[in-house]
Each structure stands twice: as C-alpha cells, then as structure tokens.
C-alpha cells in the first residue's frame, strides 16, 4: 500500500521572515514562490507545515 502524501506550495516570500521559518521552508524542500513539493504525510512534516502555515498552501 502506498504511503499518503501531501502537496505543499510556497505562496509567500521568505524574505524578512524569522530565520527558523526560512529553515523550515528549506527543510520542506521549498525554494521559491510557486514551488510545489510532494511529501509524505507524517506528524513531523505536518508540524513543519503548521510552523509556516501563513506562507504555504496544502493540498491532500
């Protein structure tokens, strides 16, 4: 059975954001506005998404 995934898209710039939030975007694999990555839906990934919820859009 395939693992559940979630699509995350960066919608706002990381310029002027807290360094921890920039690092979280990098950890999610996001590089620029409009960049989309598909990640496994794990509690750790969900925690990272919750940390930068105001800069990303999530699709299940």
UniProtKB/Swiss-Prot annotation:
Its GO CC terms are: cytosolic large ribosomal subunit
GO biological process entries: translation
* InterPro entries recorded: Ribo_uL30_ferredoxin-like_sf, Ribosomal_uL30_bac-type, Ribosomal_uL30_CS, Ribosomal_uL30_ferredoxin-like
Q: What is this protein called?
A: Large ribosomal subunit protein uL30
Record's family?
Belongs to the universal ribosomal protein uL30 family.
**What UniProt keywords are attached to this protein's entry?**
Ribonucleoprotein, Ribosomal protein
Describe the protein's quaternary organization and the partners it interacts with.
Part of the 50S ribosomal subunit.
GO MF terms, alphabetically ordered:
structural constituent of ribosome
Question: Sorted alphabetically, which Pfam families does this protein's record hold?
Answer: Ribosomal_L30
Name of encoding gene: rpmD
Which CDD domains does UniProt cross-reference here?
Ribosomal_L30 (cd01658)
Q: Which NCBIfam families match?
A: rpmD_bact
Bridged cysteine pairs (disulfide): none
């Amino acid at each position: 059975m395939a693992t559940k995934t979630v699509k995350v898209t960066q919608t706002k710039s990381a310029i002027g954001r807290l360094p921890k939030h920039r690092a979280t975007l990098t950890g999610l694999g996001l590089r620029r506005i409009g960049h989309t990555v598909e990640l496994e839906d794990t509690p750790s990934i969900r925690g990272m998404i919750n940390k930068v919820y105001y800069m990303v859009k999530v699709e299940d």
